């Protein structure tokens, strides 16, 4: 998949970057509760929901910066597990998944740049997401599907004096991805991340 070919090299560069590049590279880590929903392809056309709790690592690189804002590209990748079920509870299973999105964001205020001293900020962005799910202990145990499509995202960043949070901040964001694969599974979720 083309997305995998883009994300993996990006992550390697993020992990081994130094010098000036590292000053523009910012990291966050946290949790992302996510809900996937769509129709089953079992012939019954049942409504299916998959609830996931994911651990998320988000490296982002600011490639345009000014005093109070930036434009960044990032990859809020995650891995997690959860429950898959039909909406009438006729079938329930355990799911494992990973998420490989790429996001382009406009950042303003707090943590838009390393030098920004505001205590409040936010972001608005778009991207493309790839989400792989495997289900076990269910009638859908053979399902090992992927959902992918365009994504919209937005959120706020909150900080405080360096003495209390040691310069770290908190990001609370929301996203929605519309699946364009055959099953057309969509996903929505909330990021709660600590900005390092």
Role assignments for model-derived ranges:
Residues 1-26:
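Cleavable N-terminal export/targeting peptides
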Residues 10-11, 29, 163, 183:
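A periodicity- and composition-biased signal for non-globular, repetitive helical segments
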Residues 17, 22, 38, 82, ...:
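Ubiquitous "structural anchor" signal
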Residues 17-19, 31, 86:
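Intrinsically disordered/low-complexity terminal segments and short unstructured peptides
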Residues 21-68, 188, 193-195:
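Short glycine/proline- and aromatic-enriched beta-strand/turn motifs that initiate or cap beta-hairpins
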Residues 23-35, 73-77, 122-126:
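Transmembrane beta-strand segments of Gram-negative outer membrane beta-barrel proteins
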Residues 58-71, 79-185, 191-196:
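Outer-membrane beta-barrel transmembrane domain signature
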């Amino acid at each position: 998949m083309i997305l995998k070919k883009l994300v993996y090299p990006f992550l390697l560069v993020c992990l081994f970057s130094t010098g000036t590049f590292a000053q523009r590279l910012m990291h966050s880590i946290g949790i992302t509760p996510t809900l996937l929903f769509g129709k089953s392809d079992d012939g019954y056309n049942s409504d299916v929901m998959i609830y996931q709790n994911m651990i998320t690592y988000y490296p982002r690189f600011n490639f345009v910066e000014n005093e109070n804002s930036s434009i960044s590209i990032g990859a809020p990748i995650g891995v997690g597990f959860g429950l898959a079920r039909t909406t009438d509870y006729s079938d329930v299973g355990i799911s494992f998944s990973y998420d490989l999105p790429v996001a382009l964001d406009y950042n303003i205020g707090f943590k838009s740049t390393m030098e920004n001293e505001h205590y409040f900020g936010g972001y608005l962005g778009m991207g493309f997401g790839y989400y792989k799910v495997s289900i076990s202990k269910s009638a859908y145990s053979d399902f090992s599907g992927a959902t992918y499509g365009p994504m919209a995202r937005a959120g706020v960043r909150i900080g405080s004096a360096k003495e209390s949070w040691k310069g770290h901040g908190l990001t609370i964001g929301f996203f929605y991805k519309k699946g364009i694969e055959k099953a057309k599974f969509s996903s929505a979720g909330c990021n709660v991340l600590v900005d390092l």
